[in-house]
Swiss-Prot record:
Encoding gene, per UniProt annotation: mtlD
Keywords of the record: NAD, Oxidoreductase
Catalytic activity: D-mannitol 1-phosphate + NAD(+) = beta-D-fructose 6-phosphate + NADH + H(+)
Stated name of the protein: Mannitol-1-phosphate 5-dehydrogenase
GO molecular function, one term: mannitol-1-phosphate 5-dehydrogenase activity
A Pfam match: Mannitol_dh_C
Annotated source species: Yersinia pestis
Cellular component, GO annotation: cytosol
Keyword Cytoplasm in annotation: no
Taxonomic classification: Bacteria, Pseudomonadati, Pseudomonadota, Gammaproteobacteria, Enterobacterales
Binding site for NAD(+): A3, L4, H5, F6, G7, A8, G9, N10, I11, G12, R13, G14
EC category name: oxidoreductase
The keyword Oxidoreductase belongs to this UniProt entry's keyword annotation: yes
Lineage: superkingdom: Bacteria
Amino acid sequence: MKALHFGAGNIGRGFIGKLLADAGAQLTFADVNQPLLDELNKRKRYQVNVVGEQARVEEVKNVSAVNSGSPEVVALIAEADIVTTAVGPQILARIAATVAQGLITRHQQGNTRPLNIIACENMVRGTSQLKQHVFAALSEDEQIWVEQHVGFVDSAVDRIVPPSEAGSTDILAVTVETFSEWIVDGTQFKGQPPEIVGMELTDNLMAFVERKLFTLNTGHAITAYLGQLAGHQTIRDAILDPAVRQTVKGAMEESGAVLIKRYAFDPQKHAAYINKILSRFENPYLHDDVERVGRQPLRKLSAGDRLIKPLLGTLEYQLPHDSLVTGIAAAMSYRSEQDPQAQELVTLLAQLGPKAALAQISGLPADSEVVEQAVSVYNAMQQKLAH
């Protein structure tokens, strides 16, 4: 199995790339970080530190790397059996032209073996969005050919992979938690789905996408935002603070009530899933900074993302949402010198005031009760900070 993976960052190396390599794939990473690519090509292997109760070091072997901007990538797509990505939602649109060129070359070479493309991003149906960008760069004839021979498979991914420790001298080493979940839409494959241990097929992907978004992502973000407000440095410190934990757990229970209503999830199993996630946030071996987890607040406060989407569900089913609203107010309070979106958020709040700013960012009506509620919690948070 020939595999090409876009994104040789921590998630690429520590999660998706690792599962592909473990499955015996001939794996090539595509990235723009030249020193990283050079090192991968020199060593052809790297170490993954899996941390939890039982820490272990696993080696990933027989890998190579190419620059995403090079003609080699096009040639690899023309030959590959599987193409995966972990580049972040913003970059996904940027690699579409390269993917399209690879598919055109594949067509020209008469390669009719099935190819499956799986975007492994923190977004809802990311591969379908990638497909739209790719199709925009194809002629009608090419689109027809691609529809016949190429599967665009949506997925939900879940593994916490913090940045390397400061002082870690190995550019390739990566640390990951023990838990991992990669769920793919089994209905979207062309040909037989590849056998990859750790990749689960489902015919009801949206239930899993929203379960992860509404629980892990919602909880992680709110832990970061409340943690920063309370002066904590790491996610672990924040979630061990009883006041933070109470709101985070409350928010996950509120979003969970939406999932139980929408997808008929088993309430007890979902409660266990929430507890599992809380214990993952407590992992003493993952040093995950609240500032890092909170970054890109504008994206995280947008209509389809981890804070507003579950809130809209509570409104749809007339369910409680006080903790989610507190989380939204905390996100509005996020500050970071390193994050351009945090700077933009501050500007919007100053120019428009909190009410109009939240309405503009989230798409919620400015005169709605929830916006009023979020703004009043936000104002109280700001007053507390001022004292």
